[in-house]
Amino acid sequence: MQKRDFDVNFKILDYELRIIFVHMIRIPTFTLWAFVIFAGGFCIASAGWNMSITWYIHQHGFHEADLFFSFYTQLAEWGIIVVAGGLAWAVSRRLCLFYGITAAVQGIVIWSLKQWFNAPRPATISAEQIRSIPGVDLQYWQSFPSGHTAIGLLCFGFMTVAITQLLRKNNKIIELCFLYLALAMGYSRMYLGQHNLLDVSVGGLVALTFLHTSLWLFNNWGSKVAKAQ
């Protein structure tokens, strides 16, 4: 009788722990280092190194990197958005809903900021320093902030969330790998001459704000649901 009660109680406890884990989502390594790096980039750009670092990254390239980054940057326009949504759906429809709403609202905010500031892009600031990269159509205005960097960090952040949920455990290596992919998206925008360091840094910080807020709301709502059950 005692063994049976123990088995029943253990199953109930295991079920409750799984509910709590699904609702209490945290990716501390990803968010911490993303903040440190993008905030650091913002400080460096604000200190007067914005275009000098941008030009250095843009002008020190080679053919293979040109091909890679010109392809990789396009993933922020469709590829990673779909993949992140699919992984979020695999965890739960609620997580996918949070992802979709967050991405949409962030997109509106980024678009509004671009329209408001209408900042010049590197090709407008100094056309003679721009090098030709096959397959890259340069843009000239609405530079601030970087939309590709923002959606890249948000999508890779939600991918990290989804995979840690599917694996039922946090993994620093996974978080760092996806953070590296997010940083590479921002780097590609400077490498291709489409954005400067300030654009990329602010784009990353905006996305990090939306990611953190979305996960906080998800966890807060989830805790209430778990308690109600």
Task: Please place each PLM-identified region on the residue numbering.
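N-terminal transmembrane-helix/juxtamembrane module of multi-pass inner/ER membrane proteins
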Residues: 6-80, 114-139
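Interfacial segments of alpha-helical transmembrane regions
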Residues: 85-109
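Membrane-embedded catalytic cores of phosphoryl/pyrophosphoryl-handling enzymes
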Residues: 26, 132-229
